[in-house]
Amino acid sequence: MDYVHSRANPVVKHLIKLATQRRERLRSKQSVLVGTHLIESALDHAFTLQHVFVRDGSSQHNEVATLIERCEAQRIRMTTLSGELFDAIEQMPSHTGILALFEFPHVEDFNATRGAVLIENVQDPGNVGSILRTCAASTVEQVWLSKGCADVWSPKVLRAAMGAHFLLDIIQNVELDALPDVSIAVTSLGDRSKSLYDVKFERDLVLAFGAEGAGASDELLARASHPLHIPMSGRVESLNVAAAAAICIFERERQLLASAE
């Protein structure tokens, strides 16, 4: 295994940019997976890793050693990095000592019939990742994200989603006027809004969630065929967008399961 200790190394420079710059990720269509769980999930779902990097000394840990064996069996290129370089790339300490470079898939074809969720202008990486994870736990297969969302392939979103990226078709930088002619259910407090539990969910009804605080844009609300709200006790004003998404997605799931019986 090669050993790299210089920050001047071009691969290291590229990795640091990928870890910190959305522009570099979009330009190269690459990102960085950090930690044993994400790398194991990628391998389990036949996601191609281009290059794996191990922190000097971390190969003695059982989980890392097991992944090294799997990567070697697949002839994935591997390099050892000095602790200083590894930490500069990792950004968010995971204490697992392994990361991977990968090229993320480019999906273009919208397909609401497979189950789709639209995320509009949700900027917190943790919220985006949590919504992705909820989608992966349901029968939703596609997630569409507007340009105003946190970068779906950033290390922070990847970490929050806990491997959900490998189970979903993800379309990012979506313009609302480019969406296909689909029915959209969006959370709203407007006069037309129905209770979530009064909405009849079909598999091709797209669930949409707007930004933290501001909610769905006027443009999205105008497109919505099914504005809805989650009935609450009144003791709190609103729910976190990831919590609201989980409630709505699994009400959809409940109805689809009931209709299939």
Task: Place the predicted regions along the sequence by residue.
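RNA substrate-binding interface of SAM-dependent RNA methyltransferases
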Residues: 70-73, 84, 101-192
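Glycine- and other small-residue-rich loops at beta-strand/loop junctions that grip anionic moieties
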Residues: 4, 31, 120-121, 146-147, ...
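Active-site/ligand-binding-proximal alpha/beta "capping" segment
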Residues: 185-234
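Amphipathic alpha-helical repeat scaffolds
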Residues: 35, 124-130, 239-244
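Glycine/small-residue-rich loop that forms an oxyanion/phosphate-binding "nest" at active or ligand-binding sites
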Residues: 68-99
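Boundary-proximal intrinsically disordered activation/regulatory segments immediately upstream
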Residues: 1-65, 149-150
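Short, aromatic/basic amphipathic alpha-helical patches
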Residues: 62-74, 156, 219-220
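Structured adenosyl-cofactor binding patch, chiefly the S-adenosyl-L-methionine
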Residues: 100, 134-138, 149-166, 218-261
